[in-house]
Amino acid sequence: MNVKVSNANQPTWKIVTVKSHLPEALKKLDEMAHNLWWSWSADARTLFRSLDEELWKKVDKNPIELLRRIDYDRLKELSKDKELLARMDKVYADFHAYMTEKPNAKRASVAYFCMEYGLNHVLKIYSGGLGILAGDYLKEASDSNVDMVAVGFLYRYGYFTQSLSMDGQQIANYEAQDFDRLPIERVLDKDGNQVIVDVPYPNFMVHAALWRANVGRVPLYLLDTDNELNSEYDRRITHALYGGDWENRIKQEYLLGIGGMLALQKLGIKKDVYHCNEGHAALCNVQRLVDYVQSGLNFTEALELVRASSLYTVHTPVPA
C-alpha cells in the first residue's frame, strides 16, 4: 500500500487569532457554529445553508468555514433581512434553551474516554463504527442532559482516504486538518495561553495541548501533541488515527488513558463514573489507582473504588 502525506505539516504551527467579521446582528451565528449541536439540528443546518447555498456546498457544509468565507456585502445584506433574522432568532432561542437546561444532580456524572469520535464529517477524528457509536453516545448524552465530559485526540491528519493507483493498488491519502477552520476551540488558562498537559512517559515527557469541541451540552476535550514543545518523533503521536508502528500505538494509548486523566485533573474535573469505550483508554484506571493511593487509601481500597466506578465497552469479544 502506498502512502501519500500532505506537506502541510512541514511549517511550524503558530497561534493566529482571526476575529470574526460578522455584523453585530449576526453574531449569534458564530456562537452556534462553534457548537456541534448544529450537526443534528435540521433547523440550524437549514439556517446556515440559507446564508449562501452555493458557498455552503463549496465549504462541504462546514459553518465555521462558511462564516469565514462569506462575502461581507452579503453579510450586510443578511443583517438587514428581517425574515432571516427572525429565523436566526428562533433557532438561537431553541439552542439557548437547550444549553441552559441544568442536568439532574441525582444522576451519576460520567467521564468518557475513546480513541475516536464520529460527530460530523468536517471533524476528521474517526474512521468507522467505533467512532460513529462514540459520537452518537455523546449526542444522546447531551439530549438526555447527562452530566458528562469526554476525552479524545485531535488528529492532525485523522484517518486516511482511499484512492487507487494506475495498477489498482490502494493509496492512503493523509490530508492535514486546519484546526482554525473546525468547530473546536483552544482551552485557555487565566492568562489566555493554551492549556498544556505534561504527561510523564518512561524517561521523557510529552506535552499535549488541549482543545475543546462542544457537543451540545457535552464538552469533548481533545489532546494534541503536534506542537513545538515535543520532539518531531513525539509530535506524531496524534498525527493519525491508528497510525504508525506499535510503539506509536502504545504511546497513543498511554496518552489517552494517563494523559486524559491528567487533563481532567488540570481542569479540576471529577466525575462519578469513568467509562472506557474499548481498551485503548484502559490506563486511565491505572492513573486513578495511583491517585487514590497517593490520597491515602491502601491498594485494596483503591482497587475496590476504581472497580465500583468503572464502565467498559468491548466491541471485539473474540481474538482479532
What do these predicted regions represent?
Residues 1-320:
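Catalytic cores of carbohydrate-active enzymes across secretory and cytosolic contexts
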